Amino acid sequence: MTAANLLEFDLDALAAFCEQLGEKRFRATQLFRWIHQKGQSDFAQMSDLAKSLREKLAGRAVVRPLAVLSEHVSADGTVKWLFDVGGGNAVETVFIPENDRGTLCISSQAGCAVGCRFCSTGHQGFSRNLSTGEIVAQLWHAEHQLRARLGTTERVISNVVMMGMGEPLQNYAALLPALRVMLDDHGYGLSRRRVTVSTSGVVPMIDRLREDCPVALAVSLHAPTDALRDDLVPLNRKYPIAELLEACQRYLEAAPRDFITFEYCMLDGVNDSEAQARELLRLVGERGPVGRVPCKINLIPFNPFPASGLTRSSVARVQAFAQLLVDGGLVTTVRRTRGDDIDAACGQLAGEVQDRTNAQARMRRAPIAIRPIDSAVQRRADAAPSGSATETTR
Protein backbone atom coordinates (compact mmCIF):
# COMPACT_ATOMS: atom_id res chain seq x y z
CA MET A 1 0.00 0.00 0.00
CA THR A 2 1.32 3.42 -0.97
CA ALA A 3 1.94 5.66 2.04
CA ALA A 4 -0.27 8.77 2.17
CA ASN A 5 1.61 12.07 1.93
CA LEU A 6 0.19 14.11 4.80
CA LEU A 7 1.14 17.39 3.11
CA GLU A 8 -1.77 16.66 0.75
CA PHE A 9 -4.35 16.99 3.55
CA ASP A 10 -6.09 19.99 5.05
CA LEU A 11 -7.21 19.48 8.66
CA ASP A 12 -10.58 17.94 7.76
CA ALA A 13 -8.95 15.48 5.37
CA LEU A 14 -6.31 14.62 7.97
CA ALA A 15 -9.04 14.02 10.55
CA ALA A 16 -10.76 11.64 8.14
CA PHE A 17 -7.46 9.83 7.61
CA CYS A 18 -6.94 9.51 11.36
CA GLU A 19 -10.46 8.14 11.77
CA GLN A 20 -9.56 5.43 9.25
CA LEU A 21 -6.72 4.55 11.62
CA GLY A 22 -9.16 4.34 14.53
CA GLU A 23 -8.05 7.67 16.04
CA LYS A 24 -10.08 10.67 17.24
CA ARG A 25 -10.06 14.10 15.61
CA PHE A 26 -7.89 15.75 18.27
CA ARG A 27 -5.06 13.46 17.20
CA ALA A 28 -5.29 14.97 13.71
CA THR A 29 -4.98 18.44 15.22
CA GLN A 30 -1.85 17.40 17.13
CA LEU A 31 -0.36 15.84 14.01
CA PHE A 32 -1.23 18.88 11.89
CA ARG A 33 0.58 21.16 14.34
CA TRP A 34 3.68 18.97 14.36
CA ILE A 35 3.88 18.98 10.58
CA HIS A 36 3.08 22.61 9.78
CA GLN A 37 3.91 24.62 12.89
CA LYS A 38 7.02 22.69 13.92
CA GLY A 39 8.14 21.40 10.53
CA GLN A 40 8.55 17.86 11.81
CA SER A 41 8.50 15.03 9.28
CA ASP A 42 9.66 12.20 11.57
CA PHE A 43 6.68 10.64 13.36
CA ALA A 44 8.99 9.16 16.00
CA GLN A 45 9.87 12.70 17.13
CA MET A 46 6.22 13.72 17.67
CA SER A 47 6.44 13.20 21.40
CA ASP A 48 2.84 13.90 22.45
CA LEU A 49 1.36 11.37 20.01
CA ALA A 50 0.52 7.95 21.39
CA LYS A 51 3.12 5.33 20.53
CA SER A 52 0.42 3.22 18.89
CA LEU A 53 -0.47 6.10 16.54
CA ARG A 54 3.16 6.75 15.69
CA GLU A 55 3.53 3.09 14.77
CA LYS A 56 0.43 3.23 12.57
CA LEU A 57 1.69 6.37 10.84
CA ALA A 58 5.12 4.87 10.24
CA GLY A 59 3.56 2.17 8.09
CA ARG A 60 0.85 4.13 6.32
CA ALA A 61 1.89 7.77 6.02
CA VAL A 62 4.79 10.06 5.18
CA VAL A 63 5.55 13.77 5.14
CA ARG A 64 7.12 14.06 1.71
CA PRO A 65 9.01 17.31 0.99
CA LEU A 66 10.05 18.38 -2.48
CA ALA A 67 13.62 17.72 -3.57
CA VAL A 68 15.62 20.94 -3.87
CA LEU A 69 17.53 21.17 -7.13
CA SER A 70 19.06 24.57 -6.43
CA GLU A 71 18.89 27.61 -4.17
CA HIS A 72 20.01 31.11 -5.05
CA VAL A 73 20.23 34.16 -2.79
CA SER A 74 20.06 37.63 -4.32
CA ALA A 75 22.12 40.61 -3.23
CA ASP A 76 18.89 42.10 -1.83
CA GLY A 77 18.16 39.01 0.30
CA THR A 78 15.60 37.45 -2.02
CA VAL A 79 15.83 33.64 -2.06
CA LYS A 80 14.81 31.43 -4.99
CA TRP A 81 14.43 27.66 -4.78
CA LEU A 82 14.10 25.29 -7.72
CA PHE A 83 12.12 22.19 -6.73
CA ASP A 84 11.98 18.88 -8.58
CA VAL A 85 8.37 17.76 -9.11
CA GLY A 86 9.20 14.71 -11.22
CA GLY A 87 8.77 13.82 -14.85
CA GLY A 88 11.48 16.21 -15.93
CA ASN A 89 9.62 19.18 -14.42
CA ALA A 90 10.82 21.73 -11.88
CA VAL A 91 9.06 24.71 -10.29
CA GLU A 92 10.36 27.84 -8.64
CA THR A 93 9.47 29.46 -5.32
CA VAL A 94 10.67 32.88 -4.17
CA PHE A 95 10.98 34.46 -0.72
CA ILE A 96 11.06 38.27 -0.56
CA PRO A 97 12.16 39.70 2.82
CA GLU A 98 11.02 43.13 3.99
CA ASN A 99 11.41 44.99 7.27
CA ASP A 100 7.78 44.45 8.25
CA ARG A 101 6.94 41.20 6.47
CA GLY A 102 8.22 38.16 4.64
CA THR A 103 6.44 37.22 1.42
CA LEU A 104 6.58 33.83 -0.28
CA CYS A 105 5.69 33.55 -3.96
CA ILE A 106 4.39 30.04 -4.66
CA SER A 107 3.91 28.12 -7.92
CA SER A 108 0.69 26.24 -8.67
CA GLN A 109 1.55 24.49 -11.95
CA ALA A 110 4.55 23.12 -13.81
CA GLY A 111 4.44 25.69 -16.58
CA CYS A 112 1.34 27.62 -17.62
CA ALA A 113 -1.20 27.22 -20.40
CA VAL A 114 -2.37 30.85 -20.47
CA GLY A 115 0.60 32.06 -22.52
CA CYS A 116 0.86 35.74 -21.55
CA ARG A 117 3.33 37.31 -23.96
CA PHE A 118 5.37 39.09 -21.29
CA CYS A 119 5.76 36.08 -18.97
CA SER A 120 8.70 33.71 -19.16
CA THR A 121 6.66 30.89 -17.62
CA GLY A 122 4.09 31.14 -20.40
CA HIS A 123 6.83 30.81 -23.00
CA GLN A 124 7.87 27.51 -21.38
CA GLY A 125 4.47 25.96 -22.03
CA PHE A 126 2.46 23.72 -19.69
CA SER A 127 3.16 20.25 -18.33
CA ARG A 128 0.81 19.55 -15.41
CA ASN A 129 -0.95 20.81 -12.32
CA LEU A 130 0.80 20.56 -8.98
CA SER A 131 -0.90 18.57 -6.23
CA THR A 132 -2.02 20.13 -2.97
CA GLY A 133 1.01 18.57 -1.30
CA GLU A 134 3.38 20.05 -3.86
CA ILE A 135 1.90 23.51 -3.33
CA VAL A 136 2.01 23.22 0.47
CA ALA A 137 5.51 21.70 0.40
CA GLN A 138 6.88 24.96 -1.01
CA LEU A 139 5.63 26.85 2.05
CA TRP A 140 6.65 24.02 4.41
CA HIS A 141 10.22 23.99 3.12
CA ALA A 142 10.67 27.75 2.96
CA GLU A 143 9.20 28.50 6.39
CA HIS A 144 11.16 25.89 8.30
CA GLN A 145 14.42 26.31 6.43
CA LEU A 146 14.33 30.07 6.96
CA ARG A 147 13.56 29.62 10.66
CA ALA A 148 16.54 27.29 11.03
CA ARG A 149 18.79 29.67 9.12
CA LEU A 150 17.73 32.64 11.25
CA GLY A 151 17.82 30.66 14.49
CA THR A 152 14.23 31.47 15.42
CA THR A 153 11.04 29.63 16.26
CA GLU A 154 8.94 32.66 15.28
CA ARG A 155 7.05 32.73 12.01
CA VAL A 156 9.15 34.09 9.14
CA ILE A 157 6.60 34.08 6.32
CA SER A 158 3.73 36.47 6.96
CA ASN A 159 2.36 36.75 3.42
CA VAL A 160 1.80 34.25 0.63
CA VAL A 161 1.15 35.22 -2.96
CA MET A 162 0.06 32.64 -5.53
CA MET A 163 2.04 34.46 -8.21
CA GLY A 164 4.66 31.89 -9.12
CA MET A 165 4.52 29.55 -12.10
CA GLY A 166 1.04 28.71 -13.35
CA GLU A 167 -2.54 29.98 -13.25
CA PRO A 168 -3.83 29.05 -9.78
CA LEU A 169 -7.50 29.07 -10.73
CA GLN A 170 -6.87 26.50 -13.46
CA ASN A 171 -5.73 24.17 -10.66
CA TYR A 172 -8.57 24.88 -8.28
CA ALA A 173 -9.01 21.35 -6.88
CA ALA A 174 -5.46 21.42 -5.49
CA LEU A 175 -5.42 25.13 -4.66
CA LEU A 176 -8.42 25.14 -2.32
CA PRO A 177 -7.11 22.63 0.27
CA ALA A 178 -3.69 24.31 0.10
CA LEU A 179 -5.27 27.67 0.97
CA ARG A 180 -7.07 26.06 3.90
CA VAL A 181 -3.77 24.71 5.23
CA MET A 182 -2.23 28.18 4.98
CA LEU A 183 -5.15 29.82 6.80
CA ASP A 184 -5.73 27.20 9.50
CA ASP A 185 -4.71 28.36 12.98
CA HIS A 186 -3.30 24.89 13.61
CA GLY A 187 -1.25 25.18 10.41
CA TYR A 188 0.39 28.41 9.29
CA GLY A 189 -2.28 30.72 10.71
CA LEU A 190 -2.07 33.28 7.91
CA SER A 191 -4.68 36.02 7.62
CA ARG A 192 -7.02 35.97 4.62
CA ARG A 193 -5.83 39.51 3.94
CA ARG A 194 -2.25 38.25 3.69
CA VAL A 195 -2.87 35.39 1.27
CA THR A 196 -3.29 36.55 -2.31
CA VAL A 197 -4.42 34.55 -5.32
CA SER A 198 -3.36 36.13 -8.60
CA THR A 199 -5.31 35.21 -11.71
CA SER A 200 -5.24 36.11 -15.37
CA GLY A 201 -9.04 36.14 -15.25
CA VAL A 202 -10.69 32.70 -15.02
CA VAL A 203 -14.13 34.17 -14.36
CA PRO A 204 -16.08 31.06 -13.20
CA MET A 205 -13.35 30.15 -10.72
CA ILE A 206 -13.21 33.68 -9.32
CA ASP A 207 -16.85 33.11 -8.38
CA ARG A 208 -16.00 29.71 -6.88
CA LEU A 209 -13.19 31.20 -4.80
CA ARG A 210 -15.57 33.87 -3.50
CA GLU A 211 -17.91 31.13 -2.28
CA ASP A 212 -15.34 28.67 -0.94
CA CYS A 213 -12.38 30.57 0.46
CA PRO A 214 -12.27 34.32 -0.20
CA VAL A 215 -8.73 35.61 0.18
CA ALA A 216 -7.14 38.72 -1.30
CA LEU A 217 -7.48 38.79 -5.10
CA ALA A 218 -5.08 40.18 -7.68
CA VAL A 219 -5.98 40.25 -11.37
CA SER A 220 -3.43 40.38 -14.17
CA LEU A 221 -5.03 43.12 -16.25
CA HIS A 222 -2.13 44.63 -18.24
CA ALA A 223 -4.29 46.42 -20.82
CA PRO A 224 -7.23 48.84 -20.80
CA THR A 225 -8.91 47.45 -23.94
CA ASP A 226 -9.99 44.03 -25.15
CA ALA A 227 -8.11 44.46 -28.43
CA LEU A 228 -4.76 44.79 -26.68
CA ARG A 229 -5.50 42.36 -23.85
CA ASP A 230 -6.52 39.67 -26.34
CA ASP A 231 -2.91 39.64 -27.51
CA LEU A 232 -1.11 40.14 -24.20
CA VAL A 233 -3.33 37.80 -22.15
CA PRO A 234 -4.94 35.28 -24.55
CA LEU A 235 -7.45 34.14 -21.91
CA ASN A 236 -9.18 37.49 -22.52
CA ARG A 237 -10.63 36.05 -25.73
CA LYS A 238 -12.71 33.70 -23.55
CA TYR A 239 -13.38 36.04 -20.63
CA PRO A 240 -13.27 39.65 -21.90
CA ILE A 241 -12.65 42.62 -19.66
CA ALA A 242 -16.29 43.49 -18.93
CA GLU A 243 -17.03 39.93 -17.72
CA LEU A 244 -13.86 39.98 -15.64
CA LEU A 245 -14.76 43.29 -13.98
CA GLU A 246 -18.25 42.01 -13.18
CA ALA A 247 -16.67 38.98 -11.48
CA CYS A 248 -14.42 41.32 -9.50
CA GLN A 249 -17.42 43.29 -8.28
CA ARG A 250 -19.10 40.07 -7.15
CA TYR A 251 -15.91 38.95 -5.43
CA LEU A 252 -15.79 42.12 -3.35
CA GLU A 253 -19.03 41.08 -1.65
CA ALA A 254 -17.07 38.44 0.30
CA ALA A 255 -13.45 39.58 -0.03
CA PRO A 256 -11.30 40.24 3.07
CA ARG A 257 -10.17 43.51 1.47
CA ASP A 258 -12.44 46.20 0.06
CA PHE A 259 -10.56 46.45 -3.22
CA ILE A 260 -9.16 44.33 -6.03
CA THR A 261 -5.52 44.68 -7.04
CA PHE A 262 -5.05 45.07 -10.78
CA GLU A 263 -1.57 44.20 -11.97
CA TYR A 264 -0.29 46.09 -15.00
CA CYS A 265 3.07 45.15 -16.53
CA MET A 266 4.60 48.24 -18.15
CA LEU A 267 5.67 47.46 -21.73
CA ASP A 268 7.47 50.10 -23.74
CA GLY A 269 5.35 51.41 -26.60
CA VAL A 270 2.66 48.79 -26.03
CA ASN A 271 0.48 49.72 -23.03
CA ASP A 272 2.20 52.69 -21.37
CA SER A 273 0.92 55.81 -23.16
CA GLU A 274 -0.92 58.71 -21.54
CA ALA A 275 -3.97 57.82 -23.59
CA GLN A 276 -3.91 54.27 -22.22
CA ALA A 277 -3.62 55.58 -18.66
CA ARG A 278 -6.78 57.60 -19.27
CA GLU A 279 -8.49 54.55 -20.78
CA LEU A 280 -7.60 52.63 -17.64
CA LEU A 281 -9.10 55.36 -15.48
CA ARG A 282 -12.30 55.22 -17.49
CA LEU A 283 -12.38 51.41 -17.43
CA VAL A 284 -12.57 51.11 -13.63
CA GLY A 285 -14.42 54.38 -13.04
CA GLU A 286 -18.10 55.29 -12.86
CA ARG A 287 -18.35 55.48 -16.65
CA GLY A 288 -16.70 52.13 -17.22
CA PRO A 289 -18.53 49.11 -18.68
CA VAL A 290 -19.65 47.84 -15.25
CA GLY A 291 -19.41 51.06 -13.22
CA ARG A 292 -16.84 51.81 -10.56
CA VAL A 293 -14.63 48.92 -9.43
CA PRO A 294 -12.88 49.62 -6.09
CA CYS A 295 -9.28 48.82 -6.87
CA LYS A 296 -5.58 49.44 -6.49
CA ILE A 297 -3.34 49.54 -9.55
CA ASN A 298 0.06 47.88 -9.21
CA LEU A 299 2.38 48.93 -12.02
CA ILE A 300 5.07 46.31 -12.66
CA PRO A 301 8.29 47.12 -14.53
CA PHE A 302 8.71 44.45 -17.19
CA ASN A 303 11.59 42.04 -16.66
CA PRO A 304 12.86 41.39 -20.21
CA PHE A 305 13.75 37.99 -21.62
CA PRO A 306 14.88 37.39 -25.21
CA ALA A 307 11.90 35.37 -26.47
CA SER A 308 9.35 38.04 -25.59
CA GLY A 309 10.28 40.65 -28.19
CA LEU A 310 9.22 43.26 -25.61
CA THR A 311 11.11 45.91 -23.66
CA ARG A 312 10.65 47.67 -20.33
CA SER A 313 9.05 51.11 -20.10
CA SER A 314 11.42 53.85 -19.00
CA VAL A 315 11.34 54.98 -15.38
CA ALA A 316 10.04 58.36 -16.51
CA ARG A 317 7.24 56.73 -18.50
CA VAL A 318 6.21 54.59 -15.55
CA GLN A 319 6.23 57.63 -13.27
CA ALA A 320 4.16 59.68 -15.72
CA PHE A 321 1.65 56.84 -16.14
CA ALA A 322 1.39 56.41 -12.37
CA GLN A 323 0.90 60.13 -11.81
CA LEU A 324 -1.99 60.25 -14.27
CA LEU A 325 -3.69 57.43 -12.37
CA VAL A 326 -3.07 59.09 -9.01
CA ASP A 327 -4.38 62.41 -10.32
CA GLY A 328 -7.46 60.54 -11.54
CA GLY A 329 -8.14 59.24 -8.03
CA LEU A 330 -6.74 55.71 -8.22
CA VAL A 331 -4.53 54.26 -5.51
CA THR A 332 -1.42 53.34 -7.49
CA THR A 333 1.80 51.59 -6.57
CA VAL A 334 4.93 50.84 -8.56
CA ARG A 335 6.42 47.47 -7.79
CA ARG A 336 10.08 47.56 -6.84
CA THR A 337 11.89 44.78 -8.67
CA ARG A 338 13.43 42.21 -6.33
CA GLY A 339 15.69 39.28 -7.12
CA ASP A 340 16.24 40.12 -10.78
CA ASP A 341 19.93 39.20 -10.45
CA ILE A 342 18.86 35.59 -9.82
CA ASP A 343 15.93 35.62 -12.29
CA ALA A 344 13.45 35.66 -9.41
CA ALA A 345 11.59 38.85 -10.34
CA CYS A 346 8.02 39.04 -11.59
CA GLY A 347 7.60 37.27 -14.93
CA GLN A 348 11.03 35.64 -14.83
CA LEU A 349 10.10 32.31 -13.25
CA ALA A 350 10.42 29.54 -15.81
CA GLY A 351 11.69 26.44 -14.04
CA GLU A 352 12.06 23.38 -16.24
CA VAL A 353 8.94 22.18 -18.03
CA GLN A 354 8.15 19.26 -20.34
CA ASP A 355 5.90 21.33 -22.62
CA ARG A 356 2.64 19.60 -23.60
CA THR A 357 1.10 22.65 -25.26
CA ASN A 358 3.63 23.51 -27.98
CA ALA A 359 3.75 26.96 -26.42
CA GLN A 360 7.44 27.40 -27.12
CA ALA A 361 6.79 26.99 -30.84
CA ARG A 362 3.71 29.22 -30.84
CA MET A 363 5.54 31.96 -28.96
CA ARG A 364 8.12 32.27 -31.71
CA ARG A 365 5.65 34.21 -33.83
CA ALA A 366 6.14 37.97 -33.89
CA PRO A 367 4.45 40.04 -31.17
CA ILE A 368 1.43 42.13 -32.11
CA ALA A 369 2.22 45.22 -34.16
CA ILE A 370 1.36 48.17 -31.93
CA ARG A 371 1.04 51.68 -33.32
CA PRO A 372 4.00 53.72 -32.00
CA ILE A 373 3.23 56.26 -29.31
CA ASP A 374 3.06 59.84 -30.52
CA SER A 375 6.52 61.40 -30.25
CA ALA A 376 5.22 64.43 -28.35
CA VAL A 377 3.64 62.13 -25.76
CA GLN A 378 6.95 60.23 -25.57
CA ARG A 379 8.93 63.42 -24.91
CA ARG A 380 6.51 64.62 -22.22
CA ALA A 381 6.61 61.23 -20.48
CA ASP A 382 10.40 61.02 -20.53
CA ALA A 383 10.65 64.51 -19.05
CA ALA A 384 8.00 63.96 -16.39
CA PRO A 385 8.96 64.55 -12.72
CA SER A 386 8.72 61.79 -10.14
CA GLY A 387 5.13 60.84 -9.42
CA SER A 388 3.60 60.48 -6.00
CA ALA A 389 2.72 56.83 -6.45
CA THR A 390 4.20 54.54 -3.83
CA GLU A 391 6.52 51.59 -4.35
CA THR A 392 5.71 48.02 -3.47
CA THR A 393 7.47 44.71 -3.84
CA ARG A 394 5.85 41.53 -5.10
Curated annotation (Swiss-Prot):
It comes from the Bacteria. SUPFAM superfamilies: Radical SAM enzymes. The active site is at 92 (proton acceptor), 346 (s-methylcysteine intermediate). GO terms for cellular component: cytoplasm. This is Dual-specificity RNA methyltransferase RlmN. Reaction proceeds by a ping-pong mechanism involving intermediate methylation of a conserved cysteine residue. GO terms for molecular function: 4 iron, 4 sulfur cluster binding; metal ion binding; rRNA (adenine(2503)-C2-)-methyltransferase activity; rRNA binding; tRNA (adenine(37)-C2)-methyltransferase activity; tRNA binding. InterPro entries: Aldolase_TIM (IPR013785), Methyltransferase_A (IPR040072), RlmN_N (IPR048641), RNA_MTrfase_RlmN (IPR027492), rRNA_lsu_MTrfase_RlmN/Cfr (IPR004383), rSAM (IPR007197). CDD domains: Radical_SAM. Its EC number is 2.1.1.192. It is found in: Cytoplasm. Keywords: 4Fe-4S, Cytoplasm, Disulfide bond, Iron, Iron-sulfur, Metal-binding, Methyltransferase, rRNA processing, S-adenosyl-L-methionine, Transferase, tRNA processing. S-adenosyl-L-methionine binds at residues 166-167, 198, 220-222, 303. The keyword ATP-binding does not apply. Specifically methylates position 2 of adenine 2503 in 23S rRNA and position 2 of adenine 37 in tRNAs. m2A2503 modification seems to play a crucial role in the proofreading step occurring at the peptidyl transferase center and thus would serve to optimize ribosomal fidelity. Its main location: cytoplasm. GO terms for biological process: rRNA base methylation; tRNA methylation. Residues 374-394 are annotated as: Disordered. Its cofactor is [4Fe-4S] cluster. Binds 1 [4Fe-4S] cluster. The cluster is coordinated with 3 cysteines and an exchangeable S-adenosyl-L-methionine. [4Fe-4S] cluster binds at residues 112, 116, 119. Disulfide bonds join 105-346. Residues 98-341 form the Radical SAM core domain. Belongs to the radical SAM superfamily. RlmN family. The gene is rlmN.
